[in-house]
């Protein structure tokens, strides 16, 4: 068995321009640029493919990294996956922080979707300059709701696996608070 994973070390995505990406994440997201690797040869494969690999501190020991690959074809999206599926979500402290973040992003000229209610958290969505969808989320759920969802998770996955239709066991998740039925 694999030893216990301690945490995610970093998450890496491709970018169009490393300098522009670092500047955007520092200015817009308040992240700190910490490290850069640049090589002409990929250490793991030995391939000749020059790259710049930049790392940003997201806070809480979390690291976001990007690769600029100037010799590769222009980056694109997976044409078979909707844009809303692949995204990176960051947590903010509370709803006030979420609303402040939305105002900040809009002041930067960034289109923001939301806040969207997800039962146990609220989110806003937007894109970085590379086309990566980002989410800022704040937790609003109760301990009882998290316990209920944990108990339902195996049942829901099994039902989905059999039917490929959304199970209704936790449909309260996307109803606004005044419409949410009491917990069982």
Regions found by a protein language model. Give the residues of each.
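A short, acidic/glycine-rich surface segment
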Residues: 40-44, 71-77
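Vicinal oxygen chelate
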Residues: 6, 17-20, 71-73, 81-83, ...
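Short, extreme N-terminal leader segments that mark the start of a protein/domain
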Residues: 1-16
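Short glycine-/small-residue motifs
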Residues: 63-66, 136
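Histidine-centered active-site/metal-ligand motif
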Residues: 9-10, 48, 53, 64, ...
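Short, well-ordered beta-strand micro-motif
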Residues: 55-57, 68, 127
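Core segments of cupin and vicinal oxygen chelate
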Residues: 14-63
